[in-house]
Amino acid sequence: MMQSRTHTCGQLRIENAGEHVTLVGWMENVRVVGNNFAFLVLRDFYGTTQIVVETEEIMNIVKGINKESTISVTGTVRERASKNPKQPTGEIEVVPEKIELLGRCQYNELPFEINRSRDADETQRLKYRYLDLRNPAVKKNIILRCNVIAALRQAMMAHDFLEITTPILTASSPEGARDYLVPARKHPGKFYALPQAPQQFKQLLMTSGFDRYFQIAPCFRDEDARGDRSPGEFYQLDMEMAFAAQDDVFAVIEDVLPPIFAKYGKYNIASSAPFRRIAYKDALETYGSDKPDLRIDLTCKNISDLFESSEFEPFKGQTVKAVPISNCHLTRKQIEKLLTDCEVQAGTKGYWFKMDENGELAGGVAKFVQGCKDELTQRLGLTPNTLVVIAAGASATKLTGVLIKTFGANVEGHMDKERYEFCWIVDFPMYEIGDESGELEFCHNPFSMPGGGAATLDKAIRGEIDPLTITAQQYDLVCNGIELSSGAVRNHDPEIMIKAFELVRLGEDDVKKKFPAMYNAFCYGAPPHAGIAPGVDRMVMLLAGEDSIREIIPFPMNKNAQDILMGAPSEVTQKQLDELHIASPRTKNKTGSRRTAPHRRGSFCMGPERGDLRLFLLQFRRPGRII
């Protein structure tokens, strides 16, 4: 029977010298220095302790134990002769009188060294995630995640929010990404969906008479992975407030997040309230992005008028935007390398020139802009050693956003990296012209309250104003160039909702059919309400200073939405499929070709109804929006 530990492996100090103790943990390393003399490192969740073997009996036991086996060590604490000030337990060691094997590691070789697991191939790390997580450098991100979630929960409750859980099995609804569908055994041919967000439920809670709601909500979206987005499952701090406007939501977030970022973040400085507010249009004009990184002091200037009649064809009659970068001492090679990286990201060509130390324009396209040197100097504030990077054409705005972030991070003196800088992006357009349809569509969230309410929509319906000029009471929360969340003042009035959809060629019946619960609830008197849902995973990624969101998730999927550790997704038995009334995709006809599942009850396919839903979705929502 295992003897209970008296201390953890990170607990013992010089004051414990002479004490009789029992430690348990993983045998991290063994260094044999003589016939009956060896140093062991014992590791548990809390830290490491050095064990010094000095007897033949104990040495024989140690020789039969592989690294990463779990053991119990009972012995006496003594002061180290050679201390290690880098370790909390570096002043002591334990001399064992007894070592007991608790759980044997059956392999002589590990897939990777535990303390170097972050350098291993990612597929190996995910396959052996339980080994990867033994690495303190990996484990600390999960601990950080736990601490941040606990702090968020405590802060929200201090603001009188109630934590209410909402259903995981629900109806499929158009929210921007593909649903994860769950077949209903008792209802052949019908499906539940895992919620992309608790959007409708939290609005229904407001209609039910609850005043302030929150939860750490699991969300499920069948979308592709990227650095700041994990496929499949993610979590958000979902919140909603009744009888609230935009400023009420802002006040809560501005009070909750900065202290948590300052306490748990890699940097200890965070924006204080109020956060800067930037109109969507101004963000694009000034920063080339609706996700500006305000730690960077660079902005872009529109200089199109200077090149309306230019002989340089790429600039002639085009939108031309410039980003001046003062005190730039990059070489030509360095400039062109960074510019090429930006071109790849934005998918369009960039240009540059520089005012040298003598005040002359040189390099890049300098010879094509010499004719307007004085105007450029005045408009861009050029001084010696100022680099100017330029974007032109239809993708100029997109490229300037990339130029600002790339050069801002690589030219010394233009980015205060060690801080968290928040801002709100406000006044989003309600509508836009769809790239594929060429017709009016909702720009983001169709259930945001339009600026000006019903009166503005009526004018647009009558043709008195351009629908593209209507703004939505929607807002994004951005930190260090990363979108943490979207939120909105909700459209709680059924009549205004119908008018909003009418402009995109959808009628009252469409709204009632696709969103019956919410529409009907609003007809019984809904309060004005507003909310937001910052992404927990993205917040923790920022706080940890990680580039990949997978580093802060205990058991993440890979980029291809596969759980390598558990083997998901996996095939299931024909019996399971039959119980769910699903035709097997592996079924083949007599010629050996794959049989197409028919559009009938019990088939696992997208029927006409589901197809209509996707078409409906595409009319009003961009993929992957977090609301």
Write out the residue ranges for each language-model feature.
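Generic short N-terminal amphipathic or hydrophobic helices
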Residues: 625-626
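Class II aminoacyl-tRNA synthetase catalytic cores and aaRS-like
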Residues: 1-590, 602
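Ala/Thr-enriched low-complexity intrinsically disordered regions
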Residues: 591, 596-597
